[in-house]
């Protein structure tokens, strides 16, 4: 189960990196202002950095078999999940409001960069994140062995 958690964590980070690259490209290309995005830059940064840092704790746990490293990874991953939920809630509002062009959308309307996220990537990232959290938590609790 611990190796499965490692793989799901790495795939989840890969999906997150895809979303981050899309966001950076779109943000840099057209918007140049913090008001253009609905996702707080500190939340995006903390989410990404903590996810990678937590993965390092998980790898250290796998190598050293120290239970406290597993619990540190659980705590970090829990924080990452909360930040992810904050971003998901904000992204859903953007996705819905810009899904179908209506009378409120004109050529001058600024579309946030996160509107360009591919829906399948966002959904897969979320499902993998939940799966990773469950696997990491169950492994830390001792279910399924190492």
Q: Predicted regions span which residues?
A:
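Transmembrane alpha-helix entry/boundary detector in multi-pass membrane proteins
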Residues: 1-8, 33-49, 69-73
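N-terminal signal-anchor/start-transfer transmembrane helix
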Residues: 5-30
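Membrane-helix exit/interface motif
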Residues: 22-29, 53-67, 87-90
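Cytosolic, membrane-interface loops and tails of multi-pass inner-membrane proteins
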Residues: 26-39, 97-113
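Core segments of alpha-helical transmembrane spans in multipass integral membrane proteins
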Residues: 40-59, 75-85
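Short alpha-helical packing/oligomerization segments
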Residues: 63-95
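Individual transmembrane alpha-helices with interfacial aromatic-anchor signatures
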Residues: 111-128
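Juxtamembrane boundary at the C-terminal end of a transmembrane helix
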Residues: 132-146
């Amino acid at each position: 189960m611990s190796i499965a958690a490692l793989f799901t964590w790495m795939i989840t980070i890969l999906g997150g990196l895809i979303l981050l690259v899309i966001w950076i490209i779109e943000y840099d290309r057209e918007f140049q202002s913090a008001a253009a995005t609905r996702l707080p830059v500190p939340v995006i940064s903390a989410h990404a950095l903590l996810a990678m840092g937590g993965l390092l704790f998980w790898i250290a746990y796998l190598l050293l078999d120290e239970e406290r490293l597993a619990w540190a990874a659980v705590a970090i991953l829990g924080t990452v999940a909360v930040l992810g939920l904050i971003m998901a809630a904000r992204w859903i509002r953007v996705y819905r409001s810009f899904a179908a062009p209506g009378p409120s959308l004109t050529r001058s309307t600024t579309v946030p960069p996160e509107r360009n996220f591919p829906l399948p990537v966002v959904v897969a990232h979320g499902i993998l994140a939940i799966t990773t959290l469950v696997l990491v938590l169950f492994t830390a609790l001792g279910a399924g062995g190492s």
